[in-house]
A protein has these predicted regions:
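A hydrophobic membrane-anchoring feature enriched in long, contiguous, low-charge segments
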Residues: 4-29
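Catalytic core of membrane glycerolipid acyltransferases/transacylases, capturing the structured
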Residues: 20-41, 51-53, 68-124
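Glycine-rich helix-loop-beta junction characteristic of Rossmann-like nucleotide cofactor-binding loops
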Residues: 62-66
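Generic preference for hydrophobic
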Residues: 60, 73, 95-96, 202-204
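Structural motif marking the loop-to-transmembrane transition
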Residues: 1-11, 34-38, 103
Length: 237
């Protein structure tokens, strides 16, 4: 059954994505936020399919912690699920991502129109300056900013290196940081075709005032909170 559900989801994804990419391209004349609301409908459709085809549901703990003003989300990264679900759970957001993702046919074209902060990871300090410049603009435009400090998907029970770029951005922009932990990787593995039914738990921490931190201390505080929650969400056997 899991195989058939996963196959049906993949087929639906293949059928839905190209026509939605055309819809996304048609949003080009719209204001950024209006454009985002239309394009993020694809992610909402994928989460609907995940629930009704794959049997993957989710619950959110700590939604009351979301500040009223745009913030920087620093989250655990385990699968593609959270990149979709966050567009349902959180206010309109942009992602800090590697620019190569924008080169993917259909998916990348639509992604480019959501106003992401696309950086060249190999350009070092120039990438940080670019991230800060675009970050301030996006926050002023009413967007939240979502970043995975580990930089890549990490298997449940494992921990990657927490890079300080997201904390550095928050400190430089004076934006609050919202730490997020989840266990999506237990059901939707990294690069896995098979996706298992169940309920993903997403935990949202209290916002952290970046203005009272250095990038290093903020990064450490985020890591401590996330990994503390992960011990319960993804206990090591």
């Amino acid at each position: 059954m899991t195989f058939l559900r996963s196959l049906a989801f993949l087929i639906a994804q293949i059928l839905v994505t190209p026509p939605y990419a055309i819809i996304a391209l048609a949003t080009f004349p719209l204001p950024r936020l209006a454009r985002y609301r239309v394009i993020s409908g694809w992610s909402r459709a994928m989460i609907w399919l995940a629930k009704n085809v794959l049997g993957i549901q989710y619950r959110v703990i700590g939604a009351e912690n979301l500040p009223r003003t745009p913030a920087v989300i620093l989250s655990k990264h385990q699968s593609a699920w959270e990149t979709l679900a966050f567009q349902v759970i959180f206010p309109p957001q942009v992602w800090v991502l590697k620019r190569e993702l924008l080169w993917i046919p259909f998916f990348g074209w639509g992604l480019a129109l959501t106003s992401p902060i696309a950086i060249n990871r190999s350009s070092g300090a120039r990438a940080l300056r670019r991230m800060a410049e675009l970050g301030r603009k996006r926050l002023a435009q009413g967007f939240w900013i979502a970043i995975f400090p580990e930089g890549t998907r990490v298997r449940p029970g494992k921990k990657g290196t927490y890079h300080p770029g997201g904390a550095w951005l928050a400190v430089n922009c004076g934006a609050p940081v919202v730490p997020v932990a989840h266990n999506a990787g237990l059901l939707w593995g990294r690069g896995a075709f098979l996706k298992h039914p169940g309920t993903v738990t997403v935990e949202i921490g209290a916002p952290i005032d970046a203005r009272s931190h250095t990038p290093e201390s903020l990064n450490a505080a985020v890591e401590e909170w996330i990994e503390g929650r992960m011990a319960n969400l993804c206990p090591v056997p």
